[in-house]
Every structure is written in structure tokens, then in C-alpha cells.
């Protein structure tokens, strides 16, 4: 009767599986079939016989696979409820299936083999070794039955190692039992694997040349591949003694297989894992056999053979692995020589370097890049860096670097052998470009290491390359009329042009070498005359190509340190740089400047600035010449852009700091700022800055024309406003008093001392800046008011979007790839709207930068300005409701944070508290509303739809901006309230990267975080205190893991601890504790967040439970909480007389209590849990038994259910 039922059910199941797998089935039928199959697996009592019948080899593959899936489901989810006989029957049936129910090795489907091995491993995980002691013997018996069974045994051993050791997918006790039993049998297992490999390889090599035995040869090859894969799964964790046993027999076998095409990749994988292992010095020392003649011969010949037949994907993949093996060998050698002085450099070290250099000169950019780290380790190594073989390879390495630094090999191009390899490694030119830039940065570090060892050779080669480029004719490459090809204007170079890529590479090389050479050589050894000669050649070089000119400018900067030894050269250098400041590529044409031209001019200004910053003493004797140059350029209002003017003014200010005379510098700054003061304080400007309608008209935002070709009537007005703001910021940023206290005193910069004895300085620019402050605050107030809807309507149609975020910022915020090409031949601004957008954006940023710099720059002179708090509240904090998130974020970062951090404590009450109280309250209200909208949107639309369908959607941008504003607000609160620690784990960059990545490592909550004096001051004010607490604890429930992590570890507890001594309302305590539990629900899936939140909840409960019974009521609402366990926890907590358990045990107990509210990753939320029972302890030492207990014991040992 049962067989009839089985047959009938199997027929139904076959039909259902056929419907599921038939592409022509409708969705409805497919879902019904799936439901039937799932219900069968969950509920049917005769799953095992049905599964076995469906798994017979007479069935088609999809039916067999489903039958085996049924058996796997039974083992995973029903095993604990099965009787001993049922388990034995199922185990024997599966082993019989493997022995006689499989096809020949080349015919059997891989997915059938995979599921068969999974079933056996699932049974092993539940019963071995206690209840299945003969498992290894049974596998050995199976192994002898044929090639398919051999391969399956390999799969079983590999999967067992992966589940137990690599992925650890079973309970701790079971994992420990199985791993210890594996370790006990490891010699036997590895010998078995190695013998299997050798036997099958020998058979394969004998048969592969005989066409009549091709099938048998392939079968042996399959088993060999499986044996290599299984070895790879064990080599990673077994004792190194096993790997190096019998004079490294395993390693020797793997080296031999490097020349066997079908097996070389697996052999290289195993070698790589073995050589990369960490372990005892004595054990790792034996792996030095790989530097022997035989091993080196096999590695070299394998590399040559694989590379000989052109680009074949399989061979290329092998080359990558082999390159990694050589890298690991180099790292092994470095480690061993550093640890043991008795170890000698291998005789074949030179041969190793030659083979490694071959990978460095390979056309593949990926292979070249893979060698950088190891070269760096070799060149930095204390012992190897002095080795003659390594020193001899330096010229060859530098020569290779000169080729490798050239950016060639774009996947879309065909101008280099690298291109073909890049098409395998990169999806697009943008991917390649990002990879190359990162790789070149690493390469530069290695070049600097080489220069440290042999500066003269490095400089000589850099000099030769520079001379060659100066004498070579310009090759712009093939002309392409398509603008996206990146061809330059008027026949100039593009970023792909042969000449430009050579110039760019040479410049990078020269810069790396010279910077390091000046650090390495003594003054007497520096090749000053050669350096000056090179600088003279560069200064005499004439060219009009903007891209090449940028490289020339970098070379001037790189060679400039030589001028410190020949100061007479300085005027000549400045003369050249000033000629670049006014560079035009098309003569006196009034056409808009291109990006390439703008970049050259900015680069020149930046170079002058850098020289004045780094070598002010050198420039000071030539100050008058520099000043007259700059005054001449500034006299023509249209000659330079406002940024260029400001950069040159900054250069003058930097040199003026060397006056070290307060009065002299103050007079100079008055003279320098006179044009700015005249414009800024003029009646016309005052009216424009203080009246919104006048401002709109003054900047031209009410004009309807937006054609860039039409003359811009208000362009000069905007330029003047920008010039003033740029100049105020530049002067304030660059003016400083002497760093030496005695010099500062002598120069009149010190005006007194604080009560603690610190000197009080005065800044020479203070008077000038304070004169301009009122109008600056008026501009800030006016700019903020622009965002009101009624003011936006006063703007002409194209300019209503002028206050929006620019496209480039959107792209950066969304993390979208930047376009590879900057269109150098395009105008800087294509429309007046784009120009106006940039004007408003830079003006807004610079105003807040000025207010942010005012505190640290002018110190007490700024903080004692009359009614400063009310002036700032009436300007910078006006109309915040309409200010967009990206602007508010910028304001918090560049203005509010430095204003607070540099404020003397005596001004906390009068300045900081009146500003921060309303600000924190407002920020909490704004962020709560924003996150509520985002959470509602997620519920209504589904997260995936928002995040994946259209990453450029407005919703995605808004959410990311809210996230960034949240982080900035939390950062500000922490800067105000929390004392900085020496080891600050949140010192991650404020760049908004992937949250998951930041949460990858568990962060232990810190116990040394304390409130600052400012934090204590703020907490005295009830409104500020409430805003801080609510914001900190609310942030735990916002969907931003980084903000949650920071608040949990650094903010919540110190703030709460400050108010716990007072009287907290019960409702407030309930809300605070609930917020933490909600945070766990939201962020529990991230290990780092979860650990911190559990710790915080534990701290709060332990501290407040004795005083507030209400907190117990919150605990009782947690899903699946164990009330008895909670009673036990409370009993120990509330009864001081009971001995307290260790902190970790109490915390673990608490974590188990609140487990019901800890959020899980989406992938685990609906997954059926697998329960594996622990078996009797296998390796635990039993307690000594009394004689009477021994006599009374009925069982003499462990029961074994899988006895034959």
C-alpha cells in the first residue's frame, strides 16, 4: 500500500517539477507547483522513500535533483525527530545512491554531485564522530568503486572542511568535536588526498596522448582537479607540519603540476595558500625549498609557457595566480629574514628577481600592479635592501617603471598590447582609469623606496627622461572630430595623446624621485648643478599646449628646491610662472576660456602660492619684485579671475608673515586690502548686500537672457563681490603670527596672557577684517533670505534654479562614477545659469569659511565683538527652514563647528549657549521630520525599488543628503560635548562611504568618554540639555548606521550620566530605554552597531532599573522574552547581597533577554532555522567517578547509531 502511495505521490511531484522548470508555464501554475512541492517537503511523512525513488538514475536530471533536495531537507530539518532506525536507513540509502545510483563521471551532472555531497556532509555534521565512528572507512570503501565515487568523496571532504572551519555553519561544540577529530586524522586524510592526486595524475599523463583512452584520461583529470580543490580547502588551516612533511613532498608535487595545463591553476592555488600561511618560524622556514633550483625552474618554465601562446583566458588566469605565488614568496622571504638573523638570502634570489621582473614588464596592467606591494617590501627590507642582487636590479626596475607609469591600456583602445588584457579585467574605461590611478600611487611609493637606495641612478634616469621629452616633438595622436574622443582644441593634446601620456608619466616619475632625493642625500651630495641645468631647460621650454604646460609647471615646482642653493635663479622662475598666470591659448580673443586654459592659470597661481608657503625665507629678499608683479596684474580688473587674484594676494601674505613685525605687516595688509575695502564699503555695495531686491538686480538674477554668447551686463558686479569675499578669506586664512614665542613677543604680536599662562596673540589683519564684518553678515542674511519662496519668484526664469545643487555635486553624493574625460576644449561654463549656480555656491561657502576662520584667526578680538551672538543669530541662522540640506550641512561643518571649538570658555554663556540651544532644538525637529518621511517612503515603496531601480532619482539624492546632514549634526554635537580620546575609532573620514563597510569590525563601547567643559555648560540649560538627549537617542532609530554607531559609543551614555544624578521623569526613562531597543531593531543586523547598542541598553538597565520599575515593563514587551530569566536577572541586580556574576556573563545574559528585538539581515529574516543538536562531549575530561557510581552505571561507553 505504501509503495502505491509513493508511486502516486512521485508522479504528482514529477508533474509539479516539470511545470516549475518549463519556461512556457504560466506564473500561476508555476506558483501552485512550487507550493505543492514545498508543502510536501514540510508535511509529508513519506518524504524519504519518495525522495529516494525520484533520485534514481533512471529519472531525468531535474527530477533526480529534486529528489535529492527532498532528502537534504529531511536531514536538515527532520533529523532531530527521526528514530535511530530511520536515520540508519536514510544514511545507508544515500551511501547506496552514491555507490550505485550515479552515472559515469563525465556523464553525471555537477549539480547532482553537489547535492549528494551536501546530504552526506549534513549527516556528518549531526553524527560524526560520536555516532558514526566508521565514517572515514565508509568513504574509503566508496572511493574504491569508481571515478564518480572518488570525485564525490573529494567533494564531501572539501565541503566538510568548508562548513566546519571556513564558514563555521554549526554550533560551537559540534564544530569543535568535528574539527578536533579531523585534526587527529589529518595525517591520514592528507596522505589519502596526496596519493589520490598522484595516482590520478600519473594515469592521466599516461593516457592523455592515446586518443583511444581519451575518456579515461579525462576521468582521471577530473578526479585530479577535485583532489587539488580539496587540498586547497585543507592547506589553509591544517598544521604547517603536514604541508612540509617528508621534505615538502606536497609542495614538490604541486610544483611539478605547474607545467600540466589542465591542473596548473589548481596547483598554483594550493601553492599560493601554502606560501601565504602564517605560523611558527621553524615551520615556515621549510617553505624556502621553493627558492631551490627545481622549484624555480618549474615556476619559470610554467610562466614562460603560459605567456607564450598569446592571450588565452585560462592561461592568463594561471599567470595571475603564479604572480601571486611569487609575491607571497617575496613576502615570506622578507618575514623570515626579519625574524631570524641565521637565515641566509637564497642563492637563487637573483633568479627570483628576474622572474618577478618579468611580471612587472608584462603587458597586463593588472599583473604589473600586483607586483608593487612586494617590490616595496623588498626595497624597504633592512637586510634585502643591501643585497647586491637587489641593488643590481634597480636600473631594470626603474626602466620598467618608466614604461609602466605611462597611462596606456584603455579597454576601448587598440594603441597598446595592454588594451587586450584590459578588456578581460575592466568593464569600462572609467574602471580602468580608477584602477590605474590607484596603482600609480602605489608605484610612486615604490619608486621613492628605490630612490632611497640609489638616489643618483634614479635622478640620472629622471633627468634623461625629462631631457628627452623637452626635445621630442608633440604628437597629438589621431585626429577625431567626435568631441567625446577628448581631442584638444586647435590641434592640442587630449588626455589620450601619445605626447601627453608620456609627459604625465615623466612628470610623476621626476616628482617622486626628486622629493625623495632631497630627503635622502646630504646637502654636499645633492647634484645641484645638474638640477639647476634641468630647471633652466624647463624654463626655456616654449609650448602653447595647455595639457603639456600643466606638466611643465609641475616640473618647475619639483625642481624648485634646487633654487634654495642658487637664489639668483628665483626671479627667472617667478617670471616664467607669472607668464603662465596670464596664459591664453588663442591670443587676445574674447572667446570664453576653456577648462584646459583655466587649469594652467590656476596651476601657475598655485605653484607661486606653494613656493611662498614652503620657502618664505628664500622669497622674502625678492618680496618687492613679487609685490610689483602682483600689483601690475591686479591693476587690470579683467585680466585675472577672482580666484587667481586671491591666490596671488595669498602668496604675498604668506611672505609677509616673515616680516615678524606686527606694525609693518599691518601697514602692508592695509595697503593690500585697500581696493577690497573701497569696493566692499562703497554705497552701491552696501545697498546690494543689505537689500534683497537690490542684491538680485546687482548680480543679474532678474535678467531673462541666458545665452552665454551675449555680453553679461552684471558679470563685473558679481566679479567684484566675489573678489572681495575671496580676498577677505584669503588674507584671514594666510595671515599668522610667528610660531616662535620669542619672535612673536619681539615683533609685537603678544598682547597679554590668559589666567593659565598661555600667550594671547593679535593678528595683523584683524582691524581690516572687522571693518568688513558688518557687510559680510548682511550678505549672509541676504543670501539666506534668497531661499524664501517669495524671493525665488523675483528671479528670472533661468535663474530660479541657480540656488540648486550643481550636477557635479549630485554625482559625487550619489557615488556615481565620474566621467573619464574632462572636456578640456569646452568653456568653463556653458550657460549663464551654470555660471550663476557656481557664483552663488562659492559665495555661500566662502562666507561661512570666513566666519569659521574668524575665531581661530582673530581669537579674542573676534569673540569680544559687541552683540556677536545676536548678530550671528540675525544673519547666519535666518530662514533655516528654507535652506536646503546640502547648504545647511556645509554651514555646520565650516562655520559652527570651528566657531565653537576655538571659543574661549569665558564666552560659553554669552555666545555659544544662546546659539547652540535653538540650533540643536531646530536640528532635531528638522532631522526627525526628514527621517520620518524617508521611513514612510520605504514602507510604502519598498527599499529595493528606491535604491536599485534608479540611483539618480530625486528620492535617493534627498535621502543621501539627509544622511550626510545627520552625520554633520552628530559630529557637531560630539565636538561640543565629548572629550577627544587618543584612540578614537570614529576617526574615519567624514566622507560618506558604505555604512556596512564601516560596521565590518566590532567596536567595543568606550568607557573613557567624558563630557567637555562646554558639554557640561550646555547641559546646565534645560532646553539645550533636552535637545541634546532627544537628538542623541533619536539618532539610534534613524536609518544611518554610522550616526547610530557614533551616538551609541560616544554620546548617549555621557549625556545620560550627566543628568542621572538629578530627578528624571519615569516617562523620559521609558522613552530613552525604548529608543535604544528600537535602535537594536533597526541596526541589529550590523555586528558593530549591535554590540554597542546592547552594551548601552545593558548600562541603562543596570543603572536605572533599581530606581524605575517602568523600565521593567518595557523589557516585558520584548517579543519572546523569557520572564523567568528576566526575574533571575532582576533578582541579582536588585539584591546587592547576592554575589554578582562577571560583567561579561551578566551582559551575555542580558543580550539573550533582549534577543527578540535585535534586527536581522533581510536574508535571514525569513530563513528557516537549522537546529543541530550537540552530542555527548568527546574531548572534555570527565570528572573522576566514585566506585559506587561506576558500579551503578549501566552504559560502558558512547552509543553508536551508525554501526555496521
From Swiss-Prot:
Q: Name one GO molecular function term.
A: RISC complex binding
Spell out the InterPro entries in the cross-references: ARM-like, ARM-type_fold, Exportin-1/Importin-b-like, Exportin-5_C, Importin-beta_N, XPO1/5
Main localization (coarse): nucleus
SMART domains, sorted: IBN_N
| Annotated region described as Necessary for interaction with Ran, given as residue ranges | 1-108
Task: Name the domain of life this protein comes from.
Answer: Eukaryota
In the record, N6-acetyllysine modifications are located at 396
Q: Which UniProt keywords apply?
A: Acetylation, Cytoplasm, Nucleus, Protein transport, RNA-binding, RNA-mediated gene silencing, Transport, tRNA-binding
From its record, what is one biological process in GO terms?
Answer: protein export from nucleus
Mention any Pfam family matching this sequence.
Answer: IBN_N
GO cellular component entries: cytosol; nucleoplasm; RISC complex; RNA nuclear export complex
Region: Necessary for interaction with ILF3; residue ranges are 533-640
Could you tell me which residues belong to the region Pre-siRNA binding? Answer: 641-642
Task: Report the locations given in the UniProt record.
Answer: Nucleus; Cytoplasm
Q: Positions of the site: Pre-siRNA binding?
A: 441, 448, 718, 1045
Name the family: Belongs to the exportin family.
Q: Which PANTHER family match?
A: EXPORTIN 1/5, EXPORTIN-5
Query: Could you describe the subunit structure of this protein?
Result: Component of a nuclear export receptor complex composed of XPO5, RAN, dsRNA-binding proteins and dsRNA. Found in a nuclear export complex with XPO5, RAN, EEF1A1, and aminoacylated tRNA. Found in a nuclear export complex with XPO5, RAN, ILF3 and dsRNA. Found in a nuclear export complex with XPO5, RAN and pre-miRNA. Found in a nuclear export complex with XPO5, RAN, ILF3 and minihelix VA1 dsRNA. Found in a nuclear export complex with XPO5, RAN, ILF3, ZNF346 and dsRNA. Interacts with EEF1A1, ILF3, NUP153, NUP214 and ZNF346. Interacts with RAN and cargo proteins in a GTP-dependent manner.
Q: What does this protein do?
A: Mediates the nuclear export of proteins bearing a double-stranded RNA binding domain (dsRBD) and double-stranded RNAs (cargos). XPO5 in the nucleus binds cooperatively to the RNA and to the GTPase Ran in its active GTP-bound form. Proteins containing dsRBDs can associate with this trimeric complex through the RNA. Docking of this complex to the nuclear pore complex (NPC) is mediated through binding to nucleoporins.
Report the protein name in the record: Exportin-5
Amino acid at each position: 500500500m505504501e509503495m502505491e502511495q509513493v508511486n502516486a505521490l512521485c508522479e504528482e511531484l514529477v508533474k509539479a517539477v516539470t511545470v516549475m522548470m518549463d519556461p512556457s508555464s504560466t506564473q500561476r501554475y508555476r506558483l501552485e507547483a512550487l507550493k505543492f512541492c514545498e508543502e510536501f517537503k514540510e508535511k509529508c511523512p513519506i518524504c524519504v522513500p519518495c525522495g529516494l525513488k525520484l533520485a534514481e538514475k533512471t529519472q531525468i536530471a531535474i527530477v533526480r535533483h529534486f529528489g535529492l533536495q527532498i532528502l537534504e531537507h529531511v536531514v536538515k530539518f527532520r533529523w532531530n525527530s527521526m528514530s535511530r532506525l530511520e536515520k540508519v536507513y536514510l544514511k545507508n540509502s544515500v551511501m547506496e545512491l552514491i555507490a550505485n545510483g550515479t552515472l559515469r563521471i563525465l556523464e553525471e551532472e555537477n549539480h547532482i554531485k553537489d547535492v549528494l555531497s551536501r546530504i552526506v556532509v549534513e549527516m556528518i555534521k549531526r553524527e560524526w564522530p560520536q555516532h558514526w565512528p566508521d565514517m572515514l572507512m565508509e568513504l574509503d570503501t566508496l572511493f574504491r568503486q569508481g571515478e564518480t565515487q572518488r570525485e564525490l568523496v573529494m567533494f564531501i571532504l572539501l565541503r566538510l572542511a568548508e562548513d566546519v572551519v571556513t564558514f563555521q555553519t554549526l554550533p560551537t561544540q559540534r564544530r569543535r568535536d568535528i574539527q578536533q577529530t579531523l585534526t587527529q586524522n589529518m595525517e591520514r586524510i592528507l596522505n589519502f588526498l596526496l596519493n589520490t592526486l598522484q595516482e590520478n595524475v600519473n594515469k592521466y599523463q599516461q593516457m592523455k596522448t592515446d586518443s583511444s583512452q581519451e575518456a579515461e584520461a579525462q576521468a582521471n583529470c577530473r578526479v585530479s582537479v577535485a583532489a587539488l580543490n580539496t587540498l586547497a580547502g585543507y592547506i589553509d588551516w591544517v598544521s604547517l607540519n603536514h604541508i612540509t612533511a617528508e621534505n615538502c613532498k606536497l609542495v614538490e608535487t604541486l610544483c611539478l603540476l605547474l607545467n600540466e595545463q589542465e591542473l596548473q591553476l589548481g596547483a598554483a592555488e594550493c601553492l599560493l595558500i601554502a606560501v601565504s600561511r602564517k605560523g611558527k618560524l621553524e615551520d615556515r622556514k621549510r617553505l624556502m625549498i621553493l627558492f631551490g633550483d627545481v622549484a624555480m625552474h618549474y615556476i619559470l618554465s610554467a610562466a614562460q609557457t603560459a605567456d607564450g601562446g598569446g592571450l588565452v583566458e585560462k592561461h592568463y588566469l594561471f599567470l595571475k595566480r603564479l604572480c601571486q605565488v611569487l609575491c607571497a614568496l617575496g613576502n615570506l622571504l622578507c618575514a623570515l629574514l626579519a625574524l631570524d638573523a641565521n637565515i641566509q638570502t637564497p642563492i637563487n634570489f637573483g633568479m627570483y628577481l628576474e622572474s618577478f621582473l618579468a611580471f612587472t614588464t608584462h603587458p597586463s596592467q593588472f599583473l604589473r600592479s600586483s607586483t608593487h606591494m612586494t617590490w616595496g617590501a623588498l626595497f624597504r627590507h633592512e637586510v634585502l635592501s643591501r643585497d647586491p642582487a637587489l641593488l643590481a636590479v634597480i636600473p631594470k626596475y626603474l626602466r620598467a617603471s618608466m614604461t609602466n607609469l605611462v597611462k596606456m591600456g584603455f579597454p576601448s583602445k587598440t594603441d597598446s598590447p595592454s588594451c587586450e588584457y584590459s578588456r578581460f579585467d575592466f568593464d569600462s574605461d572609467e574602471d580602468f582609469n580608477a584602477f590605474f590611478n590607484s596603482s600609480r600611487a602605489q608605484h610612486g611609493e615604490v619608486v621613492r623606496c628605490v630612490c632611497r637606495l640609489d638616489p643618483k641612478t634614479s635622478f640620472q634616469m629622471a633627468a634623461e627622461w625629462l631631457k628627452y621629452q623637452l626635445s621630442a616633438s608633440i604628437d597629438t595622436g589621431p585626429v577625431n572630430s567626435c568631441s567625446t574622443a577628448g581631442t584638444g582644441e586647435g590641434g592640442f593634446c587630449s588626455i589620450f595623446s601619445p605626447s601627453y601620456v608620456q609627459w604625465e608619466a615623466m612628470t610623476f616619475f621626476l616628482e617622486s624621485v626628486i622629493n625623495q632625493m632631497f630627503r635622502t642625500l646630504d646637502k654636499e651630495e645633492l647634484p645641484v648643478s645638474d638640477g639647476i641645468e634641468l630647471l633652466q631647460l624647463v624654463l626655456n621650454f616654449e609650448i602653447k599646449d595647455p595639457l603639456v604646460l600643466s606638466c611643465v609647471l609641475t616640473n618647475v615646482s619639483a625642481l624648485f628646491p634646487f633654487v634654495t642653493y642658487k637664489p639668483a635663479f628665483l626671479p627667472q622662475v617667478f617670471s616664467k610662472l607669472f607668464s603662465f598666470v596670464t596664459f591664453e591659448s588663442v591670443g587676445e580673443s574674447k572667446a570664453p576660456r576653456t577648462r584646459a586654459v583655466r587649469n594652467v592659470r590656476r596651476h601657475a597661481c598655485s605653484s607661486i602660492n606653494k613656493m611662498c608657503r614652503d620657502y618664505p625665507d628664500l622669497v622674502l629678499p625678492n618680496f618687492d619684485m613679487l609685490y610689483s608683479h602682483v600689483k601690475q596684474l591686479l591693476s587690470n580688473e579683467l585680466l585675472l579671475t577672482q580666484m587667481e587674484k586671491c591666490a596671488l594676494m595669498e602668496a604675498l601674505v604668506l611672505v609677509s608673515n616673515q616680516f615678524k613685525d606686527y606694525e609693518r605687516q599691518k601697514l602692508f595688509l592695509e595697503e593690500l586690502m585697500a581696493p577690497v575695502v573701497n569696493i566692499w564699503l562703497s554705497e552701491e555695495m552696501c545697498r546690494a548686500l543689505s537689500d534683497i531686491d537690490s542684491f538680485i538686480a546687482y548680480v543679474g538674477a532678474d535678467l531673462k537672457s541666458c545665452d552665454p554668447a551675449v555680453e553679461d551686463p552684471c558679470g563685473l558686479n558679481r566679479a567684484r563681490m566675489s573678489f572681495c569675499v575671496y580676498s577677505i578669506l584669503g588674507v584671514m586664512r594666510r595671515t599668522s603670527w610667528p610660531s616662535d614665542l620669542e619672535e612673536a613677543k619681539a615683533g609685537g604680536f603678544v598682547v597679554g596672557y590668559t589666567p593659565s599662562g598661555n600667550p594671547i596673540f593679535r593678528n595683523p589683519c584683524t582691524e581690516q577684517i572687522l571693518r568688513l564684518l558688518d557687510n559680510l553678515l548682511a550678505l549672509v542674511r541676504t543670501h539666506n533670505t534668497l531661499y524664501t519662496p517669495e524671493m525665488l519668484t523675483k528671479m528670472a526664469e533661468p535663474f530660479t534654479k541657480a540656488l540648486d545643487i550643481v550636477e557635479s555635486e549630485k554625482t559625487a553624493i550619489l557615488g556615481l562614477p565620474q566621467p573619464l574625460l574632462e572636456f578640456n576644449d569646452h568653456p568653463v561654463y556653458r550657460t549663464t545659469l551654470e555660471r550663476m549656480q557656481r557664483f552663488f555656491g562659492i559665495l555661500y561657502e566662502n562666507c561661512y569659511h570666513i566666519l569659521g576662520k574668524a575665531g581661530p584667526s582673530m581669537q579674542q578680538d573676534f569673540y569680544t565683538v559687541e552683540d556677536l551672538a545676536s548678530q550671528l543669530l540675525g544673519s547666519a541662522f535666518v530662514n533655516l527652514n528654507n535652506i536646503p540640506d546640502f547648504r545647511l550641512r556645509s554651514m555646520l561643518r565650516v562655520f559652527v563647528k570651528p566657531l565653537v571649538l576655538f571659543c574661549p570658555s569665558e564666552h560659553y554663556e554669552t555666545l555659544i549657549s544662546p546659539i547652540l540651544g535653538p540650533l540643536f532644538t531646530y536640528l532635531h525637529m528638522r532631522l526627525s521630520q526628514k527621517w520620518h518621511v524617508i521611513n514612510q517612503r520605504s514602507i510604502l515603496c519598498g527599499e529595493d525599488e528606491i535604491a536599485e531601480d534608479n540611483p539618480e532619482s530625486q528620492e535617493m539624492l534627498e535621502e543621501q543628503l539627509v544622511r550626510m546632514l545627520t552625520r554633520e549634526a552628530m559630529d557637531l554635537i560630539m565636538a561640543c560635548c565629548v572629550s577627544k580620546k587618543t584612540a578614537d575609532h570614529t576617526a574615519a573620514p567624514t566622507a560618506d562611504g558604505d555604512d556596512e563597510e564601516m560596521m565590518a569590525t566590532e567596536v567595543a563601547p568606550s568607557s573613557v568618554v567624558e563630557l567637555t567643559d562646554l558639554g557640561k555648560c550646555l547641559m546646565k540649560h534645560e532646553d539645550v540639555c533636552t535637545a541634546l538627549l532627544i537628538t542623541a537617542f533619536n539618532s539610534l532609530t534613524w536609518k544611518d548606521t554610522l550616526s547610530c554607531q557614533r551616538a551609541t559609543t560616544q554620546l548617549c551614555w555621557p549625556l545620560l550620566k550627566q543628568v542621572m544624578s538629578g530627578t528624571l521623569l519615569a516617562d523620559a526613562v521609558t522613552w530613552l530605554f525604548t529608543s535604544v531597543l528600537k535602535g537594536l531593531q533597526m541596526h541589529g543586523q550590523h555586528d558593530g552597531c549591535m554590540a554597542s547598542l546592547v552594551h548601552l541598553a545593558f548600562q541603562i538597565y543596570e543603572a536605572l532599573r533599581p530606581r524605575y520599575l517602568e523600565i521593567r515593563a518595557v523589557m516585558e514587551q520584548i517579543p519572546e522574552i523569557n520572564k523567568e530569566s528576566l526575574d533571575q536577572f532582576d533578582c541579582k541586580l536588585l539584591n546587592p547581597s547576592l554575589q554578582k556574576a562577571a560583567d561579561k556573563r551578566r551582559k551575555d545574559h542580558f543580550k539573550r533577554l533582549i534577543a527578540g528585538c535585535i534586527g536581522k539581515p533581510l536574508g535571514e529574516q525569513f530563513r528557516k532555522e537549522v537546529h543541530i543538536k550537540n552530542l555527548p562531549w568527546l574531548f572534555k575530561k570527565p570528572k573522576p567517578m566514585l566506585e559506587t557510581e561506576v558500579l551503578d552505571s549501566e552504559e560502558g561507553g558512547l552509543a553508536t547509531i551508525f554501526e555496521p
